[in-house]
């Protein structure tokens, strides 16, 4: 508990870090539509059948664009809400975004950091990707995602950040 409190205090009282976070929250978002292009980091959480995964956030289900919007709203609440309960929900959502199976930013079924550092069994170190990565190269999936974000023209593009390419595995 002491370590967590020290880390929390360091984060809260680091002026440079707070300046960077405020800039990210002022200028950034979970996604951006610019010049007819949809930009996002990570994935659009999907099910095995290629449909958008529904995620329960505080008793309501969200998917696709609505999921991005609600997560973005809660991240901002974590920093700016005057209501302590909403700030706490926002902080919980930030943890969710970092580690959860249906997080658009994480995009994996589990986080295996501990396993990679401390265990020898390779099968335990695997972080299986969200089904999004199985479908994203299909034109019908790209069209479905673009429509979800209100982009309907043939000139629209998805610019997807952080899609690792594993050359040694033949990608």
Model-assigned labels for residue ranges:
Residues 1-171:
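Feature recognizes metal-dependent phosphohydrolase scaffolds
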């Amino acid at each position: 508990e002491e370590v967590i409190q020290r880390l929390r205090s360091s984060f809260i009282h680091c002026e440079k870090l707070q300046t960077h976070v405020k800039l990210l929250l002022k200028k950034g978002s979970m996604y951006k539509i610019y010049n007819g292009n949809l930009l996002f980091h990570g994935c659009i959480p999907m099910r095995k059948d290629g449909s958008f995964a529904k995620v329960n956030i505080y008793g309501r289900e969200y998917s696709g664009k609505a999921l991005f919007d609600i997560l973005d709203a809660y991240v901002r609440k974590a920093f700016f809400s005057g209501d302590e309960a909403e700030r706490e929900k926002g902080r919980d959502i930030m943890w969710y975004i970092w580690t959860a199976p249906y997080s658009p930013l994480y995009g994996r079924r589990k986080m295996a950091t501990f396993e990679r550092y401390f265990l020898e069994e390779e099968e335990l170190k695997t972080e299986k990707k969200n089904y999004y990565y199985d479908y994203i190269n299909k034109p019908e999936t790209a069209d479905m995602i673009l429509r979800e974000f209100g982009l309907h023209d043939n000139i629209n593009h998805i610019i997807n950040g952080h899609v690792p390419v594993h050359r040694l595995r033949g990608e």
